[in-house]
Design a protein with these regions (language model features):
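N-terminal transmembrane hairpin
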Residues: 1-107
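Pore-lining and gate-forming transmembrane alpha-helices of multi-pass membrane transport proteins
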Residues: 80-81, 117, 121, 125, ...
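Juxtamembrane helix-boundary/capping and inter-helix hinge elements in multi-pass membrane proteins
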Residues: 154-163
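Hydrophobic alpha-helical transmembrane segments in multi-pass membrane proteins
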Residues: 89, 93, 175-192, 227
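Short helical (or helix-break) motifs at transmembrane helix termini and adjacent helical loops
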Residues: 137-153
């Protein structure tokens, strides 16, 4: 069934997206391969946070430069994503260690009861790494959207300074922010429908302190923060880099 769905996906991407659609298809499976590599390296005992950072960098390179080419738009987006990744990593690390997130929920214990719990691995690092991997896609998407829009503004406007270009980037970011926030929110809530049915008789305090719910709620809030931070950072980086490149090309 997965093969059939993959073929349908490929045909739709080929029909609608043409060459870009084919690149998107193979980039998707390349990203999936990176996730598999991430899991394999964790299973042999490597630090989950370091692996996650490497995977995030490789995913950013894959999504930006393979799909969109190596140009001033993608360079601006790449720099912006790396800055946000470092900022979010610091925030996630502090919260993860202080909140002591990680481990298994009561529902998971039943399915893994036959296995040994002595895996000798820091589950807090696993969750921190998972947060980084989960947020990177949204940040990349927002960043390249803003950078591409700013590049279009610059190419179609004869006279514009860095402040005006920055403002245009911020306006684009504000336009897509609400959509991004809603997408992230409903993606989380949809996974918790079964959870809410399971605990429909529980108090609000019990649910808000439940391990699985808290971990995913933290992930959601961090994703919100990353989606917001990427807007001014991309707008600023792109306003400087794109305008600088434009001035150099005109002078030559």
């Amino acid at each position: 069934m997965i093969t059939v769905l993959s073929i349908i996906l490929f045909l739709l991407l080929l029909t609608v997206g043409k060459e870009r659609g084919v690149k998107t298809f193979f980039t998707f499976y390349l990203s999936l391969l990176l996730i598999i590599i991430y899991i394999v390296f964790m299973s042999i005992g490597m630090n989950a946070i370091i692996i996650a950072l490497i995977i995030c960098i490789l995913s950013t390179i894959t999504c930006l430069f393979i799909l969109n080419g190596y140009n001033k738009k993608t360079k601006s987006a790449f720099i912006s994503v790396m800055i946000v990744l470092l900022l979010i990593f610091g925030l996630i690390y502090i919260i993860g260690k202080r909140a002591n997130i990680g481990g298994f929920s009561m529902e998971s214990l039943e399915s893994i009861g036959a296995f040994s719990y002595d895996i000798n691995y820091d589950m807090v690092n696993v969750i921190i790494g998972m947060y980084l991997v989960c947020i990177i896609g949204t940040v990349i998407d927002t960043s390249i959207s803003i950078s591409s829009a700013m590049n279009e503004v610059l190419e179609n406007t004869h006279k514009i300074n860095d402040k005006e270009l920055f403002t245009s980037g911020m306006n684009v970011g504000r336009d897509i922010l609400s959509t991004t926030i809603n997408t992230l929110f409903f993606a989380l809530i949809s996974t918790f429908i079964g959870f809410f049915m399971w605990h429909k008789g529980s108090t609000l305090g019990y649910i808000l302190n439940y391990k699985v719910f808290v971990e995913d709620l933290i992930q959601l809030l961090i994703s919100f923060i990353g989606s917001i931070l990427i807007i001014p950072i991309t707008s600023y980086i792109s306003s400087k880099l794109l305008l600088h490149k434009s001035i150099l090309s005109k002078s030559n």
